[in-house]
């Protein structure tokens, strides 16, 4: 089924088209949810909620960009909204904002296996993990992140810097990374 046929069918609430859309995009979108979630079950819940929104908002897609990108934005916003409902997420952002932490200069480790990086990202505190995902992986600006998370732009920047440093430390500790402070792009591996 072509993407156009899927879109047309989904607009008519045809179950076959909805199933095709879900089967085509759910694996990639589950990976997005998994980067934000605490566990696989939470990621699957976010995915289901996100696709419900995709189907209910199908009439708003205007063919001005990639359909997959439109779905991804809905899924990311669904993940963020779920995290914002989570008290631990808000407390994490408040604690980090209140306690300034000195971090080393920006450093970028060498390219490692994407799966290993994703697993290490999941170890990060939820506030760090969320900002890192949004900025480095999803490509949002710090201004957009500050709007999404209701935080200051400077908080987004500091969360991102601290997340990168903490992630580098985790990668070194797990012996996934052996040379700290290499100037190569390693987050590209998880996009």
PLM features: residue spans?
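A short, charge-rich alpha-helical start-of-domain segment used by transcription regulators
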Residues: 7-31
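C-terminal edge and immediately downstream basic/flexible tail or linker adjoining helix-turn-helix-like DNA-binding
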Residues: 9, 91, 147-148, 164-191
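Sigma70-family region 2
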Residues: 11-12, 48-66, 85-87
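Structural recognition of an alpha-helix C-terminal capping motif at a helix-to-coil junction
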Residues: 31, 45-52, 65-77
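Arg/Lys-rich amphipathic alpha helix in sigma70-family domain 2
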Residues: 59-63, 73-93, 110
């Amino acid at each position: 089924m072509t993407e156009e046929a899927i879109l047309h069918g989904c607009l008519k609430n045809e179950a076959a088209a909805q199933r095709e859309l879900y089967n085509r995009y759910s694996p990639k979108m589950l990976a997005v949810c998994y980067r934000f979630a605490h566990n696989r079950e939470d990621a699957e819940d976010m995915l289901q909620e996100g696709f419900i929104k995709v189907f209910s908002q199908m009439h708003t897609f205007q063919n001005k960009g990639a359909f997959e990108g439109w779905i991804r934005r809905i899924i990311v916003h669904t993940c963020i909204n779920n995290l914002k409902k989570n008290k631990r997420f808000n407390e994490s952002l408040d604690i980090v904002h209140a306690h300034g932490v000195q971090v080393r200069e920006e450093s970028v480790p060498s390219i490692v296996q994407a799966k290993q990086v994703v697993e290490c990202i999941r170890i990060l505190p939820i506030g760090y993990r969320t900002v890192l995902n949004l900025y480095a992986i999803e490509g949002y600006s710090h201004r957009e992140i500050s709007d999404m998370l209701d935080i200051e732009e400077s908080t987004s920047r500091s969360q991102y810097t601290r997340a990168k440093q903490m992630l580098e430390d985790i990668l070194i500790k797990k012996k996934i990374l052996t040379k700290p402070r290499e100037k190569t792009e390693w987050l590209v591996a998880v996009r």
